[in-house]
Amino acid sequence: RIRNGEHSMLVRVSQVPERSKGYLIDSSVATNFYPGSPQKILFRYKYVFKNLFQYGIVGEKDAGEQFFKGEQKQGFDFYSAHIFARKIGIIKSLAIGDFTVNFGQGLTQWQSLAFKKSVDVINIKREADVLRPYNSAGEINFHRGVGITLAKNNWQFTLFGSYKNIDANFVADTSQSQEDFISSLQASGYHRTKSESED
């Protein structure tokens, strides 16, 4: 039943012509040099059967990050994968892997595309499926785990569980008067230099 779907694959390689400062620094005397190539590489594969079933994988490497060597022996710096199904009996949607969650007009959480204030005062209500598959190369604004939405008549129930590591600045207290703490979360997704990789 799901064999006659549509396959799509995207491979994109881009590079800024000018060499960034991180490539020009002497690696023997500094730690903030970029050990990887200046190319940014994106790979995306997706299979979609109607609007009922899809799966896909995304791999992304930022400029300056290593590729299949050094800190990145597994290839891309970021991987994302998902399996997503809709309309299976009372199961309205089932997400396995990476997905987004959209609740409460964004007051609770809203990870899909959403517009804010505009001249159109009537268009203030956000509408989207509660669970959606994640196809992007962004490394922070999604959930990784399992989610399910059950629907019967006018009732709808959504349950999801998610666990993923995120980048953060960890500050160790040297005076022993305080506990170690996290000073900030990193949303850039860069892992080029030694300090970025340690975050």
Question: Where do the model's predicted regions map?
Answer:
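Active-site metal-binding loops of divalent metal-dependent hydrolases
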Residues: 99
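Surface-exposed extracellular loop regions of Gram-negative outer-membrane beta-barrel proteins
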Residues: 102-119, 123
